[in-house]
Amino acid sequence: MGKKITDTSFAYAGTSTGAIIAAGLAEGYSAHDLFDLYKNNLKKIFTTYSWYKRLQPKCPTYDNTNLTKILKDKFKGKCGDWKKPVYIPTTCTNIQNVEKVWDLGDKDIDKWFAILSSTAAPTYFDCVYDKNNNCYIDGGMWKNCPIDVLNAGLMKSGWSNYKILNLDTGMTTPNNESGNKTLLGWAEYLFSHWIARTSYSGVYECKSILGDDSVFHASPYHQKKIKMDKTDNDTINQIVDIWTNYYYANRSKILEFMKL
């Protein structure tokens, strides 16, 4: 676009993988930096637990050790140290109010921990515990698309006259499920098609509050869902191509929206 996205934005929100993107932009990393971070570390992030550990019924598929090391290396300091507002949803399973959003007010929370807690997707990665033994899992359990969390945080802080660019990392895919299912089938459906998808309710809400012209929902269409743990080169290149084609097809609209 000719300018760094961090030069044209003042606040960020992201859940799960989006938490890394949002935190990275707030940290001052460029979009290219974050692309390289993902591309160079995807296979390390999705390191499968040994087969004998996975014999345990509650063992997730992937060991989060490498992800933790990467986050500790790239994100130093506390959440309160960020210079721009950041909102990172997570889910705390053993407190009364399970919906938690890390932000600048969490001055005693390490940045890396806030991000890791938002990425702890059930069945994929381990739960994450803080020093008080509070248990955290993926923020996508309740807010996979935190556009309304961002808007609420900004309004609460007194911001006005802003626009929101919403990047749908899950993309738009066909909804073709029908019929009754077994208990296990419904569980898989709810997890894959609801928890892991981008809910558009927040987009509708923000458009009704800010106006249609103040919200741009960027979401490429793809014929089928792509599992988040597919890290082969063909899949990575396919995703890059999908987003590249989407950008060039909508470039004029995006630049006009951002006034670049």
Which residues make up each language-model segment?
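Patatin-like phospholipase
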Residues: 1-260
